[in-house]
Amino acid sequence: MDSASQDINLNSPNKGVLSDFMTDVPVDPGVVHRTPVVEGLTEGEEEELRAELAKVEEEIVTLRQVLAAKERHCGELKRRLGLSTLGELKQNLSRSWHDVQVSTAYVKTSEKLGEWNEKVTQSDLYKKTQETLSQAGQKTSAALSTMGSAISRKLGDMSSYSIRHSISMPVMRNSATFKSFEDRVGTIKSKVVGGRENGSDNLPPSPGSGDQTLPDHAPF
């Protein structure tokens, strides 16, 4: 029996032979850390792609560093020119909105919405609904106009009556007819009052009064 197939019994005197043999075997680091070849690619193609990936990642890092330097320089220029952050924000928003408007998705969405709007406005249901709403609006406007005219006319009549009444009272009192009527009423009143004051002298004596005098002491 060779050393590779020895008994691994812990009580065996040869228990350390296998481990010592495995420790002495050299191991290739490239074989251990190497990933399997991607399906559909040869080993040469994989190496080429990995080299290109490393190059692109290095370029990205360089571009980020350049971009950071450019942004710092841009901020310094804006600070020296006195440009505010609010103005920069407005400019960025305007630029972003312009980019959205010229984007393919926005253009397609606008065209689609335009087509839907045209289809809806040309449909019979939309036309009937629009006519119904238009008629209802006209009737409502006419009713409000009629009510407003009636209220205005009523207020005008009340105002005219009040003005005529306030104007006609002094004129009526100063008219000759009204004065003549007042004179007649005053004459009748004076006659009635004067007759009451002189009533005892003008009244005729009662029959049987004559010269008869009442006795001083009437018998009981």
From Swiss-Prot:
The modification Phosphothreonine is found at residues 177, 187. InterPro entries: TPD52 (IPR007327). Residues 40-82 form a coiled coil. Residues 189-220 are annotated as: Disordered. It comes from the Eukaryota. One of its GO terms (cellular component) is perinuclear region of cytoplasm. Keywords: Acetylation, Coiled coil, Phosphoprotein. The modification Phosphoserine is found at residues 3, 12, 19, 96, 149, 168, 175, 180, 206, 209. It holds the Pfam family TPD52. The modification N-acetylmethionine is found at residue 1. Belongs to the TPD52 family. PANTHER family: TUMOR PROTEIN D52, TUMOR PROTEIN D54. Forms a homodimer or heterodimer with other members of the family. Interacts with MAL2. This is Tumor protein D54. It comes from Mus musculus (Mouse).
